[in-house]
């Protein structure tokens, strides 16, 4: 994805009137400034994305103003306003709230500054020149297929068996989250319908399972509430989590409820392949 993003930035540079040939570095006396704003430094993936983007752009001859907004929408607005005022030639925005930047995006458009929406689509605006992302629905489908195969849901259905499941989906202000949910449910909904999968909390809609700002703490609290309210006499078999941070929250809740690896530990999914998540997988979580 990193190379695709750099290519998109190079294309946007041409839109802004820069004479740039992809793969050819910008002359030292003609450097252009790219403003990059990421949602937060609290998550490994955003740190990596920001630093990798900065490295690739600087290697291509650009100057880069990289900032992190600490999951504060107003801070991100201020960062973008300052970047516009400083005369950036292009903006790369990984938004906190996909619909909260309309006014500042209009400022950039009026200033002739192209915008690249990175990972998360910017909504309710025509100021976006490019959108660099991945197949979010495909990620959800992959998670669903992993659950289907790991638990052999078709065999369970044929045998009249069932598994319990609870859902931990992404932020409602992130357009990607709904795509992922739809991909996941495209695989799992038939098994919910025929009783092979049982969600004892009854919370299966996106509205009921989405977690604002991808909060690990909220995921942990939700999981604790599910375990206390619905699983006192039965074990939870699957935590369908859309994000590694949610998986950490579920892990903490499950450990607090006495679940043990190798005994009754449920299947937990995630996304981003953070180092801690990979270590958890190796350890059997």
What are these regions (language model features)?
Residues 15, 25-26:
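Cleavable N-terminal signal peptides
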Residues 9-19:
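Hydrophobic core
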Residues 2-5, 26-285:
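A residue-level marker of the well-folded mature domains of exported/periplasmic proteins
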């Amino acid at each position: 994805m990193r190379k695709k993003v750099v290519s998109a930035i190079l294309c946007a540079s041409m839109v802004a009137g820069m004479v740039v040939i992809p793969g050819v570095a910008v002359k030292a006396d003609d450097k252009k400034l790219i403003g990059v704003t990421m949602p937060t430094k609290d998550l490994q993936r955003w740190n990596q994305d920001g630093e990798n983007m900065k490295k690739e752009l600087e290697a291509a001859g650009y100057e880069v103003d990289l900032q992190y907004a600490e999951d504060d929408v107003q801070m991100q607005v201020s960062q973008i306003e300052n970047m516009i005022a400083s005369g950036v030639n292009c903006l790369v925005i990984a938004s906190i709230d996909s619909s909260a930047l309309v006014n500042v995006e209009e400022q950039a458009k009026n200033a002739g500054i192209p915008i690249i929406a990175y990972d998360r689509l910017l909504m309710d605006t025509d100021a976006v020149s490019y959108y660099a992302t991945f197949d979010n629905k495909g990620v959800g489908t992959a998670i669903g297929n992993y659950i289907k195969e790991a638990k052999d849901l078709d065999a369970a259905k044929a045998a009249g068996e069932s598994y319990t499941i609870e859902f931990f989906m992404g932020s409602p202000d992130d357009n990607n989250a709904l795509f992922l949910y739809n991909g996941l449910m495209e695989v799992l909904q038939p098994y919910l319908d025929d009783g092979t999968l049982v969600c004892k909390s009854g919370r299966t809609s996106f509205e009921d399972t989405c977690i604002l700002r991808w909060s690990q703490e909220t995921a942990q609290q939700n999981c604790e509430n599910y375990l206390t309210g619905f699983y006192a006499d039965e074990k939870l078999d699957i935590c369908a989590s859309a994000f590694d941070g949610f998986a950490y929250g579920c892990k903490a809740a499950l450990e607090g409820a006495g679940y043990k690896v190798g005994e009754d530990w449920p299947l937990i999914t995630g996304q981003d392949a953070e180092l801690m998540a990979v270590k958890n997988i190796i350890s059997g979580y």
